Each structure stands twice: as structure tokens, then as C-alpha cells.
């Protein structure tokens, strides 16, 4: 559909894309039968994450060379095959999701044991299935396969959102399911429409040719159905309210929702719709780029203003995510190569920084019980590494140079100018200022303010729910034995938190810095540039 040169690619029959999807499913089964052996259960979690990431990473060189690994499971209906295909766009999302599954899985072990969480086996099994769905979305070769994997994410993340089983958690879970399934119905309606008119749902760089011949109003309707269906999970306003409510979930789940799988899957679907279903040329011809950009811009501004009002740390991060995910939508809606590149680079840039923020908030809660912005005064002296990582991620979210957020936002600024969207240029600058306004007071209070009372949030001894006894053996930490629900208020071995909590957040903070300092040496830029070339025929040196 686009006049741009589409780079030649060749499908290579391979089991690897399907294996990357199936491995977490197998791990979920093994986790389920290992419930009485927590160390074995958690070993399966980490092993599955590492294997999935290794498989995904192994396909990157071939994807960049135009050799696309594909697994054709077979035809599910005339004209529709169940295909997993590792193209550059899918590789970008799969690399982020599978890589951060490793980090989230390790962190989750420390978190659920530290708090003595119940139903840990269910937690880790659902986490594994969620990542299977996320990589399935990434490698889906057509809209139908994407839809199936998209709904797998919905089903798998419901027990994670409602994990606490409180009235508030159940209500949040029901709301999430209602929104997600409603969006799924809208999405499926659009998929049926695409197949009816085009005779295929297979993705094609630059768009499906047959959709360029349909009646313009019918084309706009189909585009609206697809984008609206994906926008629910992407938390685009006014379809966002499920996300702040879902923050009742355990912090690793919040990180999964925001940085790894759920909202990223929604944003990914919007990108697929613009680039590989309709194509930028058709979207421009139908006059749909400007309205989509306007919705994204409004979401960025309103969500940033709402974030300023939140005292709950996770709620502030939730509204930040609502705003930040619309950067991706805005980038693709600008219909310029630079805008598309910026939107694509925001997948890893936002993921690294936002996951860091959530992991820091989780560590604060495990060790001190801190949940609110108004409670962080002086906590930087107790947990300096944690709050330093929080500061780095906050600066990245604001788009400060030499950090990951600047890399993506710079290209978004360039794309806005190229599109003549000076309003969006100004909006991006204002959004950066608002990010500073709602993140930096947390960092300042943590390091430079004194608490009102002598020791408002001392570090807990265990972490909560588990500790080592005199014999050096770790107590239950939530695996079936009774344990102190809070622990004693002194430092755990004199450290700010356990290695299982501190290590992952330092890794994601380091990735945020590395991506900002050396973007040309990080694979995400090369992969994103390959997507831009395949869709528009234009690349960046």
C-alpha cells in the first residue's frame, strides 16, 4: 500500500518462534506440580525466563539480515494459518518482554517470599503464562494469532491482578476483565471485517494492499475498531481507568502490567495496525493520523496532570504509564520515519525505566512498609542504592539527555517537526516538565528532607515473612509455615534489602543508563531502524 521500498525478506522454517511461546507454558505446568517444593518451583521460573530470552535473542541476527524465522502450525480456517513469525517489529517487543521476564521473575522470588505472600505457586504459573502470551503477541504472523495470544494475556493476568483476594483486589480484577474482554470483542469485530474485505489477516510491511481499495468510510470504521480494541490495554484515555485500579496487585505484577506485557501489548497492537495492517500511506489517505495523534496527545497531558495529584506511589506511576504509553501511539500516528522510530524506541526506554521505578517501590514496601509519596522523607539514607536507581529512572522518564528516555523522545521531537506538528513538539516538552514535577519531589524528599518523627520507616529485619534462623536456614517466607507478618524493625543483615530485590532494580537502572549513553551499540536501535526501513523505505544512519 505504501510507495516506499519494502526491503526483501525470506521466511525460514524454524521451530524457534513457537518454542519461545511454548516454553513458558511448559514451565507453568512444572511450576504447578512443584508447589510443595518452592525452590524447585522458582528454579523453573528462572530457567523458563532464561530459555525464552535466549531463544528470542538467537533470532535477532537473522531478523536483521532479512531471514525471518517462522513456525506454521497449520490452517485454522480457509485463508488463515496459525503462524508465528519473528520479524523485526516482533523481535523488538519480544526482546523487551523476554529480557525483562528474567528480571521480573528473579525479583518476584524475593518479593513474594519477603512479604510471605499466599498462593505463590499460582502467582508464578500465571506469570509464566502471561509471558507466553506476550511473546506470542510479538511473533504473531496475522491478526487472528495476535488476538488469541492477546486474550491469553488477559486470562493469565487476571489472577495476578486479583492476587490479594481482598474486596478491592477482586473489584479491580473484575474491572480489568470487563475492560479487556470488551476491548477484545471490539478488536475481534475489526479482525472479521479485515478478513471479509481483504481475504487475509496476514501482516505485511506497509499494509495489506486490498485494504487500500475499500470504501474510505468503511476503512475508517475498521481502523477505529482495531485501534479501539488495542487502546483498552494500552490505557489510552478514556479507556484507562482499569489501570490505576489494578495497582492493588503485588508490585511485580504492576511491573508486568506496565513495563513487560500488558499495556505494551496494547501499544504494540496499535503499531501493528498502522504499520502492517493499513500502512502509513493508507492511514494518511484516510485522514486518521491527526485524530489518533490528538487522542494520544490529550492522554499524555491529562494523565501527567493526574499523576501530580497522586499520593500513593503506585498510583502516581500508573498515571505516568498512561501518559508514557501514548508516546508510542503518538510516534506511530505522526506518520513520519523519525516519529515511528521514536515510538518504537520508547518500548525499551519506557520499559527499563518504569520497571526500575516499580521494583524500587516494591523494595521500599517490603523493607519499610512505605506506600505513599508523603512517607518517603529521609528514606534515601536508609536505602541509598534503591533511591539512586529511582532517581535515574525518573530522569529517564523526563527525557533527560544521556538516559534511555532521551533517545526515544529526541526522535519523537524530530518526527513532530517533520510532520509539521508544532503542537506536539510543545506537548512533548511540557510533558517532560510535568515528569520532573511529579517524580523529582520524591527523590528530593528521600535524600534531602528529614522525617517528621525520629524513625518513621525503619528497615525491617527479615524481609517481612521470612528470615534466617541461628542455624542459617531460611524460614518459610510464605511457603506454608507460620511466620511473623511484619518482622522486627532493624536492618536485614545491615543491608538495605535482599539481593533478590536489589539486584534486578540495579540491572534495569543500568540498562536505562547504557541505552542512553550508547544507543548505537544497543541492539534495539538497529532493530527499530529495520522496522522503519521495512515500512517506509527510509532508515537512519
Question: Which role does the model predict for each range below?
Answer:
Residues 2-18, 26-125, 466, 472, ...:
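Transmembrane helix-loop-helix hairpins at membrane boundaries of multipass inner-membrane proteins
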Residues 2-10, 182, 204-218, 282, ...:
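Inter-helical loop and helix-membrane interface segments of multi-pass membrane transporters/permeases
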Residues 38-49, 171-181, 383-387, 495-507:
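Alpha-helical transmembrane segments and their helix-start/interface "positive-inside/aromatic belt" motifs
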Residues 46-60, 180-191, 393, 505-520:
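Hydrophobic alpha-helical membrane-insertion segments
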Residues 61-69, 194-202, 519-524:
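Helix-to-loop transition at the C-terminal end of transmembrane segments
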Residues 103-116, 121, 127-146, 156-445:
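Hydrophobic transmembrane alpha-helices and their helix-loop junctions in integral membrane proteins
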Residues 151:
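Short phosphate-coordinating micro-motif centered on Lys-Gly-acidic
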Residues 201, 383-387, 441-541:
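Cytoplasmic/organellar membrane-interface segments at the starts of transmembrane helices
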Amino acid at each position: 500500500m505504501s510507495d516506499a521500498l519494502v526491503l526483501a525478506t525470506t521466511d525460514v522454517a524454524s521451530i524457534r518462534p513457537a518454542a519461545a511461546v511454548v516454553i513458558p507454558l511448559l514451565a507453568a505446568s512444572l511450576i504447578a506440580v512443584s508447589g510443595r517444593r518452592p525452590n524447585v518451583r522458582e528454579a523453573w521460573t528462572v530457567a523458563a525466563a532464561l530459555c525464552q530470552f535466549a531463544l528470542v535473542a538467537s533470532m535477532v541476527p537473522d531478523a536483521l539480515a532479512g531471514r525471518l524465522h517462522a513456525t506454521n502450525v497449520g490452517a485454522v480456517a480457509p485463508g488463515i494459518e496459525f503462524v508465528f513469525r519473528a520479524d523485526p517489529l516482533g523481535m523488538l517487543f519480544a526482546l523487551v518482554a523476554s529480557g525483562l521476564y528474567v528480571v521480573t521473575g528473579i525479583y518476584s522470588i524475593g518479593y513474594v517470599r519477603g512479604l510471605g505472600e499466599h498462593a505463590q505457586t499460582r502467582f508464578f504459573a500465571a506469570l509464566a503464562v502471561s509471558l507466553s502470551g506476550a511473546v506470542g503477541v510479538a511473533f504473531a504472523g496475522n491478526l487472528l494469532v495476535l488476538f488469541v495470544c492477546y486474550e491469553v494475556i488477559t486470562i493469565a493476568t487476571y489472577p495476578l491482578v486479583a492476587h490479594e483476594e481482598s474486596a478491592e483486589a477482586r473489584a479491580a480484577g473484575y474491572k480489568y476483565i470487563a475492560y479487556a474482554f470488551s476491548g477484545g470483542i471490539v478488536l475481534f469485530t475489526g479482525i472479521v471485517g479485515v478478513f471479509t474485505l481483504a481475504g487475509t489477516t496476514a501482516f505485511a510491511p506497509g499494509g495489506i494492499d486490498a485494504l487500500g481499495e475499500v470504501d474510505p468510510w468503511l476503512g475508517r470504521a475498521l481502523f477505529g475498531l482495531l485501534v479501539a480494541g488495542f487502546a483498552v490495554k494500552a490505557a489510552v484515555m478514556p479507556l484507562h481507568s482499569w489501570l490505576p485500579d489494578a495497582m492493588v496487585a503485588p508490585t511485580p505484577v504492576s511491573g508486568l502490567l506496565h513495563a513487560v506485557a500488558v499495556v505494551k501489548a496494547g501499544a504494540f497492537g496499535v503499531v501493528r495496525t498502522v504499520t502492517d495492517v493499513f500502512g502509513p500511506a493508507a492511514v494518511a489517505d484516510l485522514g486518521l493520523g491527526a485524530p489518533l495523534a490528538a487522542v494520544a496527545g490529550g492522554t499524555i497531558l491529562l494523565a501527567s496532570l493526574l499523576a501530580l495529584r497522586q499520593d500513593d506511589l503506585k498510583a502516581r506511576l500508573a498515571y505516568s504509564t498512561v501518559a508514557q504509553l501514548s508516546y508510542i501511539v503518538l510516534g506511530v500516528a505522526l506518520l513520519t520515519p523519525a516519529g515511528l522510530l521514536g515510538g518504537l524506541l520508547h518500548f525499551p526506554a519506557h520499559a527499563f525505566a518504569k520497571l526500575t521505578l516499580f521494583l524500587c517501590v516494591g523494595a521500599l514496601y517490603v523493607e519499610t512498609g512505605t506506600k505513599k509519596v508523603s512517607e518517603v522523607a529521609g528514606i534515601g539514607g536508609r536505602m541509598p542504592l534503591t533511591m539512586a536507581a529511582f532517581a535515574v529512572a525518573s530522569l529517564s522518564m523526563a527525557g533527560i539527555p544521556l538516559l534511555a528516555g532521551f533517545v526515544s523522545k529526541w526522535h519523537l521531537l524530530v518526527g513532530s517537526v517533520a510532520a509539521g506538528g508544532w503542537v506536539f513538539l510543545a506537548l512533548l516538552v511540557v510533558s517532560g516538565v510535568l515528569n520532573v514535577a511529579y517524580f523529582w519531589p520524591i527523590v528530593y524528599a528521600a535524600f534531602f528532607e528529614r522525617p517528621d518523627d525520629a524513625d518513621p520507616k525503619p528497615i525491617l529485619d527479615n524481609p517481612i515473612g521470612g528470615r534466617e534462623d541461628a542455624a542459617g536456614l531460611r524460614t518459610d517466607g510464605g511457603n506454608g509455615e507460620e511466620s511473623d507478618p511484619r518482622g522486627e524493625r532493624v536492618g536485614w543483615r545491615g543491608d538495605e534489602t535482599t539481593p533478590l530485590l536489589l539486584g534486578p532494580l540495579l540491572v534495569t537502572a543500568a540498562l536505562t543508563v547504557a541505552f542512553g549513553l550508547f544507543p548505537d551499540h544497543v541492539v534495539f536501535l538497529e532493530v527499530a531502524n529495520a522496522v522503519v526501513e521495512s515500512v517506509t523505505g527510509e532508515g537512519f544512519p
